[in-house]
Regions:
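Metal/cofactor-centered catalytic core regions of large enzymes
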Residues: 1-231
Length: 231
């Protein structure tokens, strides 16, 4: 039921439940509407009781603890050797979160805690993920407050060389049409460079490694997927 409500929020924001393709270089494809804000506020009110009920069922459940405590324990050294990241790495006691060590998207402006385990067993992995849901609620609440303070209609950076102009401008403005053509036809040249950027995904570090040789398409693009490494 709660997951369905989250899908409704996604659909209200970007028009799709799963393929949430709203992000663009320097911002978003469109601004959030009033209904989306209302749904997010409702979610912030209705989800904490669900989490508390969830905790009552598992956190102090003797059967659950006996089946998870001490099971499949992994040391910090082993986790690092495996290349783990995200919640399962932090469950071993390694305090590493991309949002804190290499902040992006204004994460340095948010106040939240990074839950860290001690034994690296199944119970600690569960507890880390459980606490991260609480921290996510804190981040969402702060982000919502910051967005509401921003000027209305400002949802992307002014970078016409890389950001597709609105369709209505393409049909009526020659400059917008030129930028649209350059981006779509791949006529935006970029310098020779090599870059790696990562974000903190739900399952760990999601990285993007890009090599460019100066042409109009990447020489090499590789995705560092956390699930592939973790499992």
């Amino acid at each position: 039921q709660e997951r369905e409500f989250i899908y409704e929020i996604f659909e209200e924001i970007c028009g799709a439940r799963l393929t949430t393709n709203i992000g663009r270089i320097g911002g978003f494809e469109r601004d959030f509407n009033a209904v989306a804000f209302e749904k997010i506020r409702e979610f912030l009110k209705r989800y904490p009781p669900v989490l508390k009920e969830f905790e009552e069922m598992f956190v102090r459940n003797r059967i659950f603890i006996e089946r998870t405590s001490g099971v499949a324990a992994v040391t910090p050294e082993e986790a690092l050797d495996y290349g783990w990241s995200g919640p399962i790495l932090r469950a071993t006691g390694v305090d590493y979160d991309v949002r804190v060590q290499n902040p992006y998207c204004s994460y340095e402006e948010f106040d939240f805690d990074v839950p860290v385990g001690a034994t690296g067993d199944v119970y600690d992995r569960f507890m880390v993920r459980n606490e991260e849901m609480w921290q996510s609620l804190r981040i969402i609440e702060q982000a919502l407050e910051k967005i509401e303070k921003e000027p209305k209609g400002v949802f992307h950076a002014e970078v016409p060389d890389f950001y597709l102009p609105p369709k209505e401008q393409v049909y009526t403005n020659m400059e917008a049409l030129i930028y649209h053509f350059k981006i779509v036809m791949g006529e935006v040249d970029t310098p020779k460079a090599e870059v790696y950027h990562a974000v903190e995904g739900a399952n760990g570090e999601l990285g993007f490694y890009l090599i460019h040789d100066g042409g109009r398409s990447p020489y090499r693009l590789h995705f560092r997927r956390p699930s592939f490494v973790n499992y």
